[in-house]
Amino acid sequence: MSKLVKTTVASSAIAIISYKLGDQIFNLIGNFFTDNLLAKIEIDSSLNPKLFFAIKTELEKFVDSSKLLKINDFGSQIRYELNVGFYKIKTRKHGWIFVNYVDNKLILYKLPKISFFPPQIKKQTNRLKKFIDSVHSISCRPDEMRMCYTSNNNNWSYPIIRRPCKFLDSNLTTEMRSVLKDVDVFMRNEDTYRELGANYRRGMLLYGESGCGKTGLISIISNKYGMDSYILNLNSKDMSDSVLISLASNVKARSILVIEEIDKQIETLNANGNKNVSIGGLLSALDGPQGLAHVLCYNDSQCDIFFQQITWKL
């Protein structure tokens, strides 16, 4: 009986090893085939977030809705997105395109016609490039895409990408119109700032009770002028004046640097005894980058002297 058990265990082990070895050989053959015999272009989400988002969205148009199994609840409604896997789509101009979605990457393949000789592979690679160019020209325009970054330690995180929302002009309040007029003057007078030797940036303090439209106004500014948003958290891990200045210096020109609920953030800093972040450090950070709109949001209908001083210095 013992001998039979040993034989069974040994056979099972050999079977598992054979299965693993066969699986590795299959993967090696598959990788060799796709890497050397197919036209191939790889798109990394961390390096090309806009293009990755655009092609993934385009791919979702061709895929049956039953395959949209990944849930995204960032927003007012739940959205079902594409899960990782292998897909194929048929385009009118570029024929069949195969897409492998894995590990935050999209790997696009195109099968060469007739033969696998280099000229055919090059031809199909060019067709892949034309497909990517067409998606980029349509879906990656400033008026079609907004990037929203959040601070993560001493870096800006992978962006949240959104399609611009449309706002009815009739829904704008008098105060909102006043702010938009101010931003419009700022955006149209860069040359005037330069001629006067003034720093080209604009600081705004939006204040009011929660739900009065401060965040919505930031979205309107972002959409109207094609500006990406950078959300700064003063209480993130390892935050200090030097990290604050480094983050601000890495914000791209023609963007909005936002500090939401600055009153609550400063209260939290004081409550935690955080002495690494100071008002002086905040002002120094905001004093550096050019071509930005700085927006501080304060959740109260009354601004005290302290916040008025910050507004004046901005």
Curated annotation (Swiss-Prot):
Family matches, as SUPFAM superfamilies: P-loop containing nucleoside triphosphate hydrolases (SSF52540)
Record-level Gene Ontology MF annotations: ATP binding; ATP hydrolysis activity
UniProt name for this protein: Uncharacterized protein R776
Species the sequence originates in: Acanthamoeba polyphaga mimivirus
